[in-house]
Regions:
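Phosphate/pyrophosphate- and phosphate-bearing ligand-binding catalytic cores of soluble enzymes
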Residues: 17-18, 24, 153-274, 278-296
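Short acidic (Asp/Glu) patches
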Residues: 101-104, 134-136, 165-169
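Residue-level signal for beta-strand positions within conserved beta-sheet cores that form or flank
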Residues: 93, 146, 288
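A gly/ser-rich beta-alpha-beta helix-loop segment of oxidoreductase catalytic cores
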Residues: 112-148, 218
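Structural signature of FAD isoalloxazine-binding scaffolds in flavoprotein oxidoreductases
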Residues: 31-32, 38-43, 68-86, 133-164, ...
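Short, well-ordered alpha-helical segments in soluble proteins
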Residues: 110, 128, 132-136, 151-154, ...
Length: 296
């Protein structure tokens, strides 16, 4: 497949990197290589590439905040959406957002244009494509609360539109087909009071800075919150705060964050996560689920 990609890449604007070290890209700064890493130029080229690779495994990365590639690497192609997927515009009563836009940048755009209900995105690391896929949320709002429509491309290179009603959004997940790539989303455009919007963003950022180790090498929330409970509380009450495996440690500031202290491996991160899962299950009979996506 590498030779085939090298051949077709000569006629494309998309950039291809082979045996790409994913630790350069993911926020954990850990993990293995991808056989092929592709910075996609535009939708037409993404269609071409998907048709050319056939059944060759692929995945997609946004900001790299919620992904870990195992040390053995990923024998497939990892796509990252380029600048043609990084556009926002307002059309009638909708905000049209490219999937490559960072969550925080959408919050800033909404603030500038006096659009409410997007403040929560200022507290979420990542890109809009990932936020839609996993129904990201915080501080009382989730993506499903503001989404109207999603545009995807499937593994055959076909464009498909989904309305909100067609997608079964749940806590940190959706039923979007696993073989599809989100390329854009349409959101409700509701105007609000600028000062209130700015105050909400200020409060969210303050809470985040005071409660999370945001300046460390971390992927954010490690585990999903169980129903009617909080992963961080369960982890702390299970005696896991400060627990360490190799160069990765459970944050003393927020127990649902794992921190790469220096040069942690992906296996150390995964091993520590497994220890936490076991400890919480043994104490509370609750099995935590990874919020971080692990591939390879």
């Amino acid at each position: 497949m590498k030779n085939h990609i090298k051949k077709i890449s000569q006629n494309l604007n998309s950039k291809f990197y082979f045996d790409y070290d994913m630790s350069k890209t993911v926020w954990f700064r850990a993990g293995g290589k991808a056989a092929i890493f592709c910075l996609v130029y535009d939708i037409n080229e993404l269609k071409i590439i998907l048709k050319e690779i056939g059944d060759f495994p692929f995945d997609i990365i946004g900001a790299g905040s919620n992904l870990l590639v195992r040390d053995r690497g990923f024998n497939g192609i990892i796509f990252k959406l380029g600048k043609e997927f990084n556009k926002i515009n307002i059309c009638e009563r909708s905000v049209n957002v490219g999937a490559g836009i960072l969550d925080n940048n959408l919050a800033k755009f909404a603030e500038v244009n006096n659009i409410k209900n997007f403040e929560f995105y200022s507290g979420i690391p990542g890109s809009i494509g990932g936020a839609v896929k996993m129904n990201a949320g915080c501080y009382g709002f989730e993506t499903k609360d503001v989404i109207k429509e999603i545009k995807c491309i499937n593994n055959k290179g076909e464009l498909i539109n989904y309305s909100k009603d067609q997608i079964n959004f749940d806590y940190r997940k959706s039923n979007l087909p696993v073989n599809s790539i989100i390329i854009s989303a349409k959101f409700d455009c509701l105007y609000g009071n600028k000062k209130e919007i700015q105050l909400n963003i200020k409060n969210i950022k303050k809470i985040r800075e005071n409660s999370q180790p945001i300046k460390s090498k971390t992927s954010g929330s490690t585990f999903k919150n169980p129903k009617n409970n909080f992963a961080a509380k369960l982890i702390e009450q299970s005696g896991c705060k400060g627990l360490q495996v190799g160069d990765v440690i459970v944050s003393e500031k927020h127990a649902n964050f794992l921190i790469n202290l220096n040069q942690a491996s992906a296996s150390e991160i995964e091993d520590l996560g497994s220890m936490i899962i076991d400890a919480v299950y043994n104490k509370f009979n609750i099995k935590l689920e990874w919020e971080i996506k692990i591939i390879g």
